[in-house]
């Protein structure tokens, strides 16, 4: 009975992440912030503020992190909601599990700022962060040795995954090569009129619906734009998918988004890329953000941490001198 009640409480909480035709935009944003914001960050994570590319960002630094590993987290919220405050607790847990700093940009939201405003903001953040991390790596490199490339992770959930893919599709190879992992939670991958989700009648999803998709897409951009890869990543051509960074997709078994994720993972693999689809039995959309109710939330983030850090662990045994320096951080130095 207690487990069943916890599940109901988790579903009630997670539904506040979705925006549908019956929602009021101001109420949607307010309820999300009231529910998910926190005064104290978990695991002694320290927060500082910084502008990357003139975009306000949070930088979350755990007690121990790899000095050349940094994550850009592109939050969900149906393109119309979400903020640094909403995602601080969740991203603090990610920072701890992945031994890295996490940057949360406060990008512009629809409908006041439709596509491509959010994409442009994230591109500006990425360019500025990439440049600063390169400079930092050069300054910390011993004379006569080659500077290490920064290890950048792109992570996102829901509608944020749409924006993340738009960023990746438009990056030059020199930038893509510095992205060690792409981590997508319950990604939105096809907002086009032909999307199976748009036309779904009976669904088992306890959080998401076709109505959420339609309303979010309508506020985000024009109907014609939903047919392009920057808005519907699943529609990318093979050329855009080539040399895509190693990708980890995590989601629940009961999600309406699962079929699109399976198709996307298959296409990435067909184009010679690494992709793991991690599906959690009985779980729902963004179950990772209901950790006070679902034990699976903690286990899922543990797995993300192992995926992100496994390559570095492999390097330790082969080339000790290339092991990322671990440092204690009292505050972010970005």
PLM regions: where:
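A glycine/proline-hinged amphipathic helix-loop "lid/cap" segment
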Residues: 1-63, 313-334
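C-terminal catalytic histidine-bearing segment of alpha/beta-hydrolase fold enzymes
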Residues: 263-265, 269-330, 334
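Serine-hydrolase catalytic core
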Residues: 225-281, 299
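Short beta-strand-to-loop junctions in surface cap/lid or active-site-entrance loops
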Residues: 56-67, 236-241
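Short amphipathic alpha-helix adjacent to the substrate-entry channel of hydrolases
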Residues: 85-104
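Short strand-loop-helix active-site module centered on a catalytic nucleophile
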Residues: 57, 72, 94, 115-191, ...
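Short beta-strand element of the alpha/beta-hydrolase
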Residues: 68-77
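Hydrolase active-site cap/lid region
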Residues: 169-227
């Amino acid at each position: 009975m207690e487990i069943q009640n916890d599940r109901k409480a988790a579903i009630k909480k997670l539904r506040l992440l979705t925006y549908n035709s019956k929602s009021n935009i101001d109420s949607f944003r307010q309820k999300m912030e009231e529910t998910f914001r926190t005064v104290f960050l978990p695991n002694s994570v320290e927060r500082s503020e910084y502008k990357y590319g003139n975009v306000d960002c949070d930088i979350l630094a755990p007690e121990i992190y790899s000095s050349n590993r940094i994550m850009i987290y592109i939050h969900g919220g149906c393109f119309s909601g979400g903020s640094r405050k909403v995602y601080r607790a969740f991203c603090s847990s990610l920072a701890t599990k992945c031994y890295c700093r996490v940057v949360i940009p406060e990008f512009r939201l629809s409908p006041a700022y439709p596509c491509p405003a959010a994409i442009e903001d994230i591109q500006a953040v990425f360019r500025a962060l990439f440049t600063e991390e390169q400079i930092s790596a050069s300054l910390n490199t011993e004379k006569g040795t080659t500077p290490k490339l920064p290890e950048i992770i792109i992570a996102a959930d829901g509608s944020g995954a749409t924006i993340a893919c738009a960023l990746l599709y438009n990056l030059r190879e020199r930038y893509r090569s510095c992205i060690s992992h792409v981590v997508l939670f319950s990604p939105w991958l096809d907002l086009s009129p032909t999307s199976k989700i748009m036309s779904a009648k009976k669904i088992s999803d306890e959080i998401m619906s076709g109505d959420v998709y339609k309303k979010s897409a309508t506020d985000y951009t024009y109907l014609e734009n939903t047919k392009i890869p920057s808005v519907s990543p699943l529609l990318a051509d093979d050329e855009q998918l080539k040399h895509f960074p190693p990708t980890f997709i995590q989601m629940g078994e009961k999600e309406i988004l699962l079929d699109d994720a399976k198709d996307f993972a298959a296409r990435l693999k067909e184009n010679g890329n690494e992709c793991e689809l991690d599906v959690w039995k009985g779980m729902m959309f963004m179950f990772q953000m209901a950790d006070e109710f679902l034990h699976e939330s903690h286990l899922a983030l543990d797995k993300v941490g192992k995926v992100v850090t496994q390559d570095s662990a492999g390097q330790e045994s082969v080339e000790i001198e290339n092991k990322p320096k671990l440092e204690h951080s009292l505050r972010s130095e970005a």
